[in-house]
Amino acid sequence: MQSNTLSLKIKLFRDKKSSEINYLYKKKDPSERPMVLDVLLQAQEESVDDLSFRYGCRARNCGVCTVDINGKPRLACRARAKDNDVISPLATLPVVKDLIVKRDNISRQLIGFNNIASKNNLNVEADKTYHNLTACIECYACLDGCPLHKKNKPVEKDNNNAYPFGNPFSFLKLQRLYIDPLTPEEEKLGIIEKAKSLGLETYRRDYKNLKIKCGVGINLKEEVIKPLLNAAYGDQIEKKNK
C-alpha cells in the first residue's frame, strides 16, 4: 500500500551554524512521485516560511536549483524525492543561507575570457563538439570530486575574489571558446595560458584516474579536459596515460 507522505531531512545553515529539520511531505495523491523542489516549496509554504533556496526554469535548463541530496549534487527540479533523503546545500561552494550558495567566485575566473572580438557571422558553423558543450546549464555539479577545485577551499562567502584554481566548469568555458570558429587564432594562445594558470597541470598528472561528472551528461574528461591538455602539452597526455 502506497504511503501518503515522505519523510525527509533538510539541512539549514544560518549565522554560521547548521541545523537539521525533519520534514514530512504530504503527497497530493498516493501515486505522486514529487521532485525535491516540490518538497522544498511545500516546506516553505507550510513549515519554514523563510526557507531559502534557488530555482528558476523547473525544466533542467538553468541549473540554479542544484542541491546536494544524500551528499551528491542533483537538480532539485529533476531529482525524485524518496523517504529518508537528506537535502543540503552544495558542499563544494560557500553557503550564504540554508540551501543558497555563493556561485560568482567561479565566474570571476573568466573575466576577460568570455568575449569574442570577431563580429558574428551566421555563415560560420561550429562542429558537433562545440554544440555538445553548449548543453552546460551551469549547475556546478561537476565540482564534486574535482581534485583541482578542492584546492580552493571555498568556505568564506564574503570573499569576492576569483578562485585561484580551476574546475571542470571553467575549463569547459575555455574549451568552448577555444574551439569556437569565431575565436581568432591569435586569441587561442591566451586561452591555453589561462587554462594553465588555473592549474590544468593537476589534471595532467592524474588524468587516468580523474572522475568528474556532469549534471547533464557532457563527457567532461574526453570533450573538455583531454583536448585542453593536448592543446597545452601536445601529445604528452596520450603517452603519459598509456
Residue ranges of each PLM-predicted region?
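Iron-sulfur-associated redox domains of electron-transfer enzymes in respiratory
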Residues: 2-103, 143, 147, 152-155, ...
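Ferredoxin-type iron-sulfur electron-transfer modules in oxidoreductases and energy-metabolism complexes
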Residues: 34-46, 90-91, 95-242
